Curated annotation (Swiss-Prot):
Species whose genome carries this gene: Pseudomonas fluorescens (strain ATCC BAA-477 / NRRL B-23932 / Pf-5)
UniProt similarity note: Belongs to the UreE family.
UniProt keyword Ribosomal protein, yes or no: no
Subcellular location: Cytoplasm
Function: Involved in urease metallocenter assembly. Binds nickel. Probably functions as a nickel donor during metallocenter assembly.
GO biological processes: protein folding; protein-containing complex assembly; urea metabolic process
Annotated protein name in UniProt: Urease accessory protein UreE
Residue ranges of the region described as Disordered: 132-156
Molecular function in Gene Ontology: nickel cation binding; unfolded protein binding
Keywords per UniProt: Chaperone, Cytoplasm, Nickel, Nickel insertion
Amino acid sequence: MLVIHRRTTPQATWSAELHLTYEARSKSRLRCFSAAGEDVGLFLERGQPPLHDGEFLEAEDGRIVKVCARPEALLHVTCRNAFELTRAAYHLGNRHVALQVGDGWLRLLDDYVLKAMLEQLGASTAPLEAPFQPEHGAYGGGHHHSRHGDEDFNYPPRLHQFGVRP
């Protein structure tokens, strides 16, 4: 099994690729297979942003692994004007929907209930098979409503850290 514990900087060459859906890229613990069929175990630091398309990982044995976003069934949303697009984004955000934002469009994982809501708001929707790379969110850490185990969700915010540079 190829065991991976850490992310690494972009590399010119790599020896394996992982083709993962957004849901799989969001997990810190995952058993999956490389594009070549090798068994892979991901054991990444908890509380980090999801893996993104083109990110690199380093395996315990020193091999470099490239992450590739697997195409998924999406809804491509457009509207007649910026106000309607903003309103659609507001209603999706109010439902905590993972959302990819582009110039004049939104994308979300295909969902017939959300599709109906968007069409009632006047948006146009079209099915699309493409990699999904939604916005991570302004504050970083995981969203939850739990009171038990709150210490596990004590991640530093990504916004309002004035003067702090990565």
